[in-house]
Amino acid sequence: MKRFKPLLFSLVVVLILAIWLWPRPSQTSWRLAQEVAPLPLLSQLMQDNLSPTFPVDPGQMQIWKVQVAGQRQPLYLVDSRVKNSETQPLCGAIGCAFFGYTPKDTGFQRVLATYLNPHVPPGRDLIEPTAAVENGLPQLVVNQLGAEGFQQYTLGFNGEVYEIQQIDTLARL
């Protein structure tokens, strides 16, 4: 039994190191767009999603620059809700607009455009990048509360845009 103790100790150390070093998605880090977004991204965001009749400053939206191990290029997730604004022009009855952009050539390409209900249960993030990478971008898990209950949507990148791959209902309301 004594000769197995060093082997067991070594296995435990290797297991702890493997768990600690295992690639994890970046932690939730929504920041003010004007602080982190490249100017060409803000220009593309305005061109793709905003009308000149809406006086919206995209620099006041929130952006999360997602980068996980094995990902080819950053994914910029955009929460269209404007900080410190009484009106939210990109929000409506079904939720608020969320976008995803990746660098392409000298500009940016929109790879995600959806409306999400931003209200989720405590302890849950609205969008959770995973360590699984498809076609160069991470899978995303989107948490939503709706008429069906609490649901998780798994989105995968098909090479052009994100699409729903799986819907799991975790709790009925």
Model region roles, listed by residue range:
Residues 3-7, 13-40, 44-53, 121-173:
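Acidic, small-residue rich beta-repeat scaffolds with periodic aromatic anchors
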Residues 49-74:
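N-terminal secretory-pathway/extracellular module detecting exported/lumenal segments
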Residues 53-62, 114-126:
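Repeat-based blade/solenoid architectures
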Residues 54, 86-93:
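Short consensus segments that form the blades of beta-propeller domains
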Residues 67-85, 134-143:
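Acidic/hydrophobic-patterned starts of short beta strands in beta-sheet-rich repeat architectures
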Residues 91-96, 146-150:
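Short, solvent-exposed loop/turn segments at conserved positions within beta-propeller repeat blades
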Residues 96-103:
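Beta-propeller blade signature
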Residues 104-105, 158:
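Short loop/turn segments that connect beta-strands within beta-propeller blades
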